[in-house]
Regions:
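Short beta->alpha connector loops at strand-helix junctions that form conserved
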Residues: 28, 33-35, 62, 82-83, ...
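Active-site core of PLP-dependent enzymes with the aminotransferase class I/II
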Residues: 43, 69-70, 84-93
Length: 130
């Protein structure tokens, strides 16, 4: 199963490598596409992944909209995207053209359960600031 993993700018290494580890464990080739906004992380991944992993099975691609658009036009077995809703819609539409299954992690939903006896001021601060 060949799949690209499109990662966001805010956690480019962790969110790139987590799915890559799963692909390696399953014996699946994968392409990692870190965000162009996090250029230093993208460059580090570009240097390190081919150095330590089979370059015939695992690759890193860097670039912005033209490179991503091209990659989305290709036939994949599965597409994994982490990022915003606007680009998520573009990824889903591209996947639909080839009836490619995809997983979109679009954030924005952070459910919190607050018990009746919770200190609301403290809970609000922790929810807001992590």
């Amino acid at each position: 199963m060949l799949r690209p993993d499109f990662s966001p700018w805010n956690h480019p290494v962790v969110i790139s490598l987590g799915p890559l580890v799963g692909a390696i464990a399953a014996g699946c080739p994968a392409v990692v596409k870190p965000s162009e906004i996090s250029a230093n992380a993208a460059n580090a991944l570009t240097d390190l992944i081919p150095k330590y992993l089979d370059p015939n099975a695992y690759a890193v691609v860097i670039g912005a909209i033209p490179e991503t658009t091209y990659r989305l036009s290709l036939k994949w077995d599965f597409i994994l995207f982490t990022g915003g809703c606007a680009i998520g819609k573009v990824v889903a539409a591209a996947a639909a053209k080839h009836t490619t299954p995809c997983a979109l992690e679009l954030g924005r939903a952070l459910p919190v359960v607050i018990a009746d006896d919770t200190d609301l001021d403290l809970a609000a601060k922790r929810i807001l600031w992590g």
